């Protein structure tokens, strides 16, 4: 399964859509698909669907990977209209206006945070021991909130070692953005994954500093 190719193809597609200034970076899509694969994710919650870039990539990936139960929140009228047109498998999204509307008995393998949501605190009810959280981009405020909700969480930044491609909406002189990986209830295997990412990020920063 070539998730990198899927990420590139979806990023190219969404770069031509109205509202593209708010889509996830190409490298963030690669990270999300890799995490989905590595942690054998079957149930996802995306907080802030936007115009649908992330969900479209994941559902495209699911054609090879296997069925994924996808929940998402969005309450912006423009985004809600765009989702219907942009996401190939739109009918597979279980759509909610905000996190507080989701049954607290639901538990998610993967929670993707890609926007602001005043009801973010409700993720405390929706995470369990196997949950992985990814916050797209920098979003330091949201990282701090999530770590406050999960006092034992461990967090590592996932960064790229290449700049934005010229076929996207973001400046090609800037690094392709990644995101923040958080394990709210870190197991031993999660801690190992964390340290591997920590080392990878360190090496990429060294490479960046040489350019």
Spans of model-derived segments:
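N-terminal, positively charged/glycine-rich alpha-helical extensions of SAM-dependent methyltransferases
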Residues: 1-13
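Short glycine/proline- and acidic residue-enriched helix-loop micro-motifs
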Residues: 14-18
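SAM cofactor-binding core of SAM-dependent methyltransferases
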Residues: 19-102
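Conserved acidic residues
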Residues: 42, 109, 131
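Short beta->alpha hinge that forms the Motif I/post-I loop of the SAM-binding pocket
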Residues: 74-78, 115, 138
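Active-site regions of enzymes building and remodeling cell-envelope glycoconjugates
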Residues: 89-96, 110, 128-129, 150-155
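A short acidic, Gly/Pro-enriched loop at the edge of an enzyme's catalytic core
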Residues: 103-110
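C-terminal substrate-binding/active-site "lid" region of AdoMet-derived donor-dependent transferases
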Residues: 117-211
């Amino acid at each position: 399964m070539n998730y990198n190719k899927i990420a590139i193809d979806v990023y190219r597609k969404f770069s031509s859509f109205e509202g593209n200034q708010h889509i996830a970076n190409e490298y963030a899509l690669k990270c999300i698909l890799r995490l989905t694969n590595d942690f054998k994710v079957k149930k996802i919650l995306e907080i802030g669907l936007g115009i649908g870039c992330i969900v479209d990539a994941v559902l495209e990936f699911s054609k090879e990977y296997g069925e994924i139960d996808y929940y998402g929140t969005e309450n912006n009228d423009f985004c809600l209209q765009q989702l219907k047109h942009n996401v190939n498998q739109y009918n597979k999204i279980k759509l909610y206006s905000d996190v507080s509307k989701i049954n607290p008995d639901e538990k998610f393998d993967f929670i993707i945070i890609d926007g602001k949501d005043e009801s973010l605190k409700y993720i405390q009810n929706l995470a369990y021991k196997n949950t992985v959280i990814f916050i797209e981009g920098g979003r330091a405020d949201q990282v701090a909130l999530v770590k406050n909700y999960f006092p034992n969480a461990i967090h590592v930044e996932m960064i790229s070692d290449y700049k934005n491609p010229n076929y996207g909406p973001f400046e090609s002189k800037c690094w392709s953005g990644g995101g923040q990986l958080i394990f709210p209830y870190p197991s031993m295997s999660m801690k190992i994954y964390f340290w591997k990412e920590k080392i990878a990020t360190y090496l990429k920063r060294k490479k960046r500093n040489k350019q």
